[in-house]
UniProtKB/Swiss-Prot annotation:
A Gene Ontology molecular function term of the record: structural constituent of ribosome
Pfam families: Ribosomal_S16
Leader sequence segment: none
PROSITE patterns on file: RIBOSOMAL_S16
Name of the gene this protein is made from: rpsP
Family: Belongs to the bacterial ribosomal protein bS16 family.
Chain segments annotated as transmembrane: none
InterPro entries listed in its UniProt record: Ribosomal_bS16, Ribosomal_bS16_CS, Ribosomal_bS16_dom_sf
Organism from which the protein derives: Yersinia enterocolitica serotype O:8 / biotype 1B (strain NCTC 13174 / 8081)
Disulfide bridge map: none
Keyword line: Ribonucleoprotein, Ribosomal protein
Classification via Gene3D superfamilies: 3.30.1320.10
Protein's recorded name: Small ribosomal subunit protein bS16
Amino acid sequence: MVTIRLARGGAKKRPFYQVVVTDSRNARDGRFIERVGFFNPIASGQAEALRLDLDRINHWVELGATVSDRVSALIKEAKKAA
């Protein structure tokens, strides 16, 4: 099953997440089909905290991809900010 979820990057104590479309059987930070955005939970000042390609996310959801709970909340936040 294809899912849209977060893949963790960054350093210890300084997380940075990529929003990726991947097969649910792949490892959290493993192979992915497409990168559709990023989320920086510790962004401050002028740093961009969230960027999502909503067109591509909608495309994958129409094809049957499931969305993780956290990514669903981020999509809601991005739509509110737009």
